[in-house]
């Protein structure tokens, strides 16, 4: 992802306070209700990227999105871009690539390489990355706990595409975070393979967070935040 920020004057700024004299768990300050997010979806500012806070955030329909020059920004947009696995759209050209086994796809083989590539890949219209070293470290910890998952797309021994996200397995919801591709169609190929896998596992919904025409072309759609939160209940 990546965006320029405009904070509405009406924004309710919620600062997480930390007290070093209190242990980590008892000092944990909860997120405000998602209904208090501003019109752009910005809900809260501040706090640390601990495993506990991140897991709590995703289970509440909240995700971090900011760049290295900013404090941690927490978002819960309305509407929410999602993909229902059964609504996946696969173009004729992609079907041909899949039929011909154009790439090899693996899962959780090299999470660290995937998130590093997502951070470093050049994206049109972006001068930097939101996947900071802090983000990479936090999500690597989540991966080690089995919560963050990766998809790798290979051309021989070369990693040419991939994506990663958070798997709320108990809720049958996968929250996509970022993808990259160094050759044409590699990330899309990996995404299609992931959706097929998740569909077989009974996943109800893939959270795509915000609208893009690319996601819409794959079958994703916008639903209300209220409807989205129903899948996390």
List PLM regions with ranges.
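N-acyltransferase acceptor-side catalytic subdomain
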Residues: 6-233
